[in-house]
Amino acid sequence: MPKRILQGVVVGDKNEKTVVVRVERRFAHPLLQKTVRRSKKYKAHDENNEYKIGDTVSIEECAPISKDKRWTVIAAQGK
């Protein structure tokens, strides 16, 4: 099974070797047929503490690193 890759914005970088990434998804509401935005936060591994708040990054699913971390940052898309 291939690893999932998501794109989001870094919203937290206070933890050592960890960033919090907000991933937003859009979908059509089943009743109203209006586009709805929902977001979810993922903790991702950042080995060199190189990503800062506001950076757009891609994260990839990986084996569990800690209780909450199951994602690792693979690339930055820009600010």
UniProtKB/Swiss-Prot annotation:
GO CC, alphabetical? cytosolic small ribosomal subunit
Stretch forming the signal peptide: none
Record-level Gene Ontology MF annotations: rRNA binding; structural constituent of ribosome
Gene3D superfamilies, per database record: Nucleic acid-binding proteins (2.40.50.140)
Indicate yes or no for the key word Cell inner membrane. no
Q: Which GO terms describe its biological process?
A: translation
Assembly, in brief, is: Part of the 30S ribosomal subunit.
Per the similarity annotation, which family is this? Answer: Belongs to the universal ribosomal protein uS17 family.
Q: What is the designated name of this protein?
A: Small ribosomal subunit protein uS17
User: Per UniProt, what is the name of the gene that codes for the protein in this document?
Assistant: rpsQ
